[in-house]
Curated annotation (Swiss-Prot):
Pfam families: HSA, Myb_DNA-bind_6. Residues 253-332 form the HSA domain. InterPro entries: Homeodomain-like_sf, HSA_dom, SANT/Myb. Its main location: nucleus. It is found in: Nucleus. The keyword DNA damage applies. It comes from the Eukaryota. It comes from Debaryomyces hansenii (strain ATCC 36239 / CBS 767 / BCRC 21394 / JCM 1990 / NBRC 0083 / IGC 2968) (Yeast). Residues 118-132, 792-803, 845-855, 935-974, 1020-1035, 1051-1062, 1084-1107, 1163-1181 have a biased composition (Low complexity). GO terms for cellular component: NuA4 histone acetyltransferase complex; nucleus. GO terms for molecular function: chromatin binding. Gene3D superfamilies: Homeodomain-like (1.10.10.60). The gene is EAF1. This is Chromatin modification-related protein EAF1. The lineage of its organism: Eukaryota, Fungi, Dikarya, Ascomycota, Saccharomycotina. Component of the NuA4 histone acetyltransferase complex which is involved in transcriptional activation of selected genes principally by acetylation of nucleosomal histone H4 and H2A. The NuA4 complex is also involved in DNA repair.
Amino acid sequence: MMIKEEAEGILKQRNSKLEELLHLAADPLLTDISSHKSRVSEFLNDNDITKEKTFVVSSLPGVSGSGSFAEAMSQSVSKSIYKVEEAKERTENAAIEQGLKRRTESISDDRKLKISRKSSSQLSDSRSGSISKSTSEITKPVAPPVKSQKENIHLETKDFLNRDIGELEILSVPEHYPTKPPNVSSLAELYYLTQTLPLIKLLPGSHKTLITENYELALLEGKIAVLYSRIEELKRQGKWSLRQPKRYYDPYIYTKSNNGKKTFHGDSLLEEGKWMAADFKEGSKYKKACCVTMAQAVNDYWTYGKVMCIRRKRIWHIGERREEEEIHGDLETDLVDGADSMAIDDINVDNDCAPLEITGNELQNIVVSDDKVSTEPISNDEPQRKEEDDIDSAEVADQEVSEDPSQDKPVDELIPEEEVELSSIDVKLLLSRPKPEDEIVPTNLPTFSEDDLKEMGRDSKDSAPFKLHANLNDLKKIDQSIIKNLPKFTAFDNEDSNMPAPALKPVDSPMIAVSRLLHPFEEDDEWYKIVLKEGDSHKSKSNVSSGPPEYQKGLFGFQSHRRFNYLKPPKPPLIKNIEFRSPTIWLPQDDKHLIHYVAEFCFNWDLISEHLSPSAATLRKYESNIERRTPWQCFERYIQLNEKFQFSDMKGIYSYQAQSWLEHAHRAQSTTKRRISPLGVGNESIQRGHRRLRWASLFDAMRKSMKKREDAIAKLNHRRTPVDYSANNTNVNSPEASNNGTPGPNNGKRPMDRVPTPAELSKLKFERDKSIQEAYLNQQATRSRMIAAVAQQQKQQQNNQGNIPRPPSQGPGPNVGVPPPQRGQIGVQGGPTNTPTGSLGNQVPPSQQPSQAAQGGMTKRPTTPNGTAYTAEQIQQLLQIQKQRRLMQQQNQPGKTGISPSQPNTPALMQNMPLSSNKTTVGGSNMPLSGMPNSTQQVSLSQQGQKQQLGPSQRQQVPVSQPSQGQGSSTGVPANKSRIHFAPAQVSAIINSIQTKNPNLTKEQVTKLAATYLANIQQQQQNRANQQQQQPPSQHSGAIGQGPAAHRPGQSQSPSNQKKPQVATLTPQERNQLQMLKAAKTAQQQQLQHQQQQQQQQQQQQQQQQQRRPGSPMVPNAPLDPNNMAKLEYEQRKNLLIQKHQQQQRLGNNSNIPGQSTPNLASMPPSSSSSPSSSVSGPASNLPNSNKNVPKK
């Protein structure tokens, strides 16, 4: 029982081993074991040991009877591996049929499959009875075969050579041409790689040997990243040009930094110049050496004879018979150097022996014949004499003519030169033609042989002092090869085959290097290589089967820049011009080019437009509307051709504008009969003989230009606003307007309409400076004339008034002959005589200030010493500080009040003024007064006495009236009548007004009329002063204390004459200033009332002080003089008008005067010296057109 069980166990083990052998033989890689179960039982039955059947190896699948089991296993393994490729091909074919378009097929794979099929067929034939066919079909391959690189190259080469020659393209290309083009990647791809996987980060962690090139490549990637980012930045800014010009290298800098690696045109010129200089220098040396050699040859010929001549071989012509002896003799003559000269003469070789050098006789003949030398080949067939070797060819011709017997003369007739006396010269002999053989007797040549020369140490072959030729053997081998390879020219060769290429072609530039004239060292034209290239059919198959399809090639596949670009419209034109557009005509070839360029340049419309334009943009020529190809017109035509276009396809910054433009164009086309959109026509639709309707577009362009001019004129006439009209009307009678003939500074055109060119600005500045200079000269002339006329009238009036004492004056000037009150008025009204007219805002009489405000407009606001403008709060604080200071001055000095004109302005006070007053600002202008005459300094100093009270020095207002001597008035003012003195600006304004109204009058007549008018004004003022003197003093004092309601007959209130400010047009800052000024006025009124209450007490205290000072010119207990009262009223009115004038300047009712200076805060009027509603009285208020005729600068 135990034995039976052991036998069954052994049998089972045997069967399991046999089953394993079966699986290994059928499927060595054991891919699918379950498929072989049906064959196991059959195999075990065939090898059942119970039936006395022994195991046979050949029964295994794949094992033949003659082979071993190991060979069968190796064949089975290779078979299963090749089946992998076969299965892969099957799956790829199935994928292509399903639409995936994936197929990889190569020649090597086909050969492998053929081999596997052969082996499988052999295996199936060997064991057809034992193993079924399903076993080989069920096996599934797993891995490709593992082969070395050498084996793969060998298989590919063998497959390439076994391919049919019809599938290949045979190319013959020069040897130095590259066979395969280099791989090129786009900048975007390189930038992406540098940002994702930069080499500079991968190199430190690499596990291979690194060399310098790896790090240089990493640095190059960094440079590419910087370059790409910079290009993208320039593209966003619109600064990246479509065409990149060649970089310019400065010759000096580039050569200095790069050691002359790059040559320029200038360098080529220098090199050619150096070469030519060397060539000329060596050429002159060569000529000198030739001359020396020739002279030496002549000397040797006459010294040693014919032995120094070169032997020449006789020339045998066609038809002549040459005997062998003569030929042999000639050869001996040429080859043997030691031939005898007499033998040479016997064979008539001496006729052939002629020296190559120029003999002495020939030199004489050359001189005689005026350097006319002609060389002729010497022929041996003509008999010649021995002397002909020394005769010039021209003389030989003359000798042949003279051999005529009729012209020959006997030799006896010739008289020797020795017998001819100087006193008797035969003219016939001079006129007769001489014979050289008679006159020139050649000397006998010496006869030397070669042996004689050798004995003397001379050689006939090497007699030249210099070497004038180059021997080929003396050169180097490279130079010899160059000379030997130079092309040779023969007369009867084929020109096309043997003639070398021309050194210079007509299309080449004239500057050619010297080496260009030589034959090239490397003859590339002779060496070509044969390149076998795959045909188009195989290339299409390989493209289909190489890798995934186009849409699966990743981010940087083939033409990836075209796949991921979206439609970016250019900037559209203005929508308002849609109705006036003319359509563009597009021919079929234009559409074809447009589609091609759109695909080529990826919706870069500017570049597409450049390529579609008929000519370059730099060529200025007329281009009709229908021929233009702007970026927008190209885009419009493209979307017209694209039937699938939608607004959602547009991306970019102009997408919204382009969509709105297209919508407006569609609506305009539906309402307009004329076509607006582009028109595509065929070649047959274009009219004949018109150049694309260019004539029609010419008329259209002319019509548009005419319409544009008419529209411009209409806009110019209707664009003027009421503010411009008012400004122009204000400036109509200005001096500049009257001189230039223009309606005003605006000329009916706003500044924002047109920007003047630099030439126009320069012209305007020149005209303005010229008009200012003329106006200044006219003012000076008029002022001098008016001062003389006024001085003359004053003298006449003083004579009529009687004995009126005149106080001493500070110096000569325009105040000479004018009483002290009038000097004070001049100091208040006139100001410095040399100040510009634009700075007279605070020196002009009150009635003239509104007119200047109308002309000058709003001045600049008060500024700090640094030039910055004060704010409204700072101005209010300064006004309060000034108010407090004036109150303190009135309390500390009760005898000197701000409104009392009775305080004298003594010369001592004028002298004690600071020296810096010579350069103080007058009316806001920084004009130094140091260079002015004494009269001008007095006037400016008298006015500055008024302005000192507003500064931070807390100075009291100093009246400008001069003290009188010997008068009984308590105020120190004489009892004469008050007079008025006009400023130069007022006089010039009056003259300009008269000249404008009467242009036909001359300057003298205008001056006389102005003088008469001023005299009338002064007379009226005097009459008013006389009426005021007759009134009792109580009325004057009452007039002073009337306050805001004061008004007298014959006077006009200034607020009624002034223009009310337009509050609606004020800025918030100006409104704050206006409120501040109103508050200051209220404070002034309150302060004025307080001052009027204290006036009586102040007068009493002043009288007491005058009594204590006996030397004082003031007389105590004297009532107020009427003149002083009138002056006090005048000061009040003046200060009020100054304040009003500054208010109007801040409100900005009028235009600015060019050149007017900024008033300082110190030039503001005193806030406590006037009433806002006080009346105005002055002779200047009656001037004609006084509000328009103040000249401006």
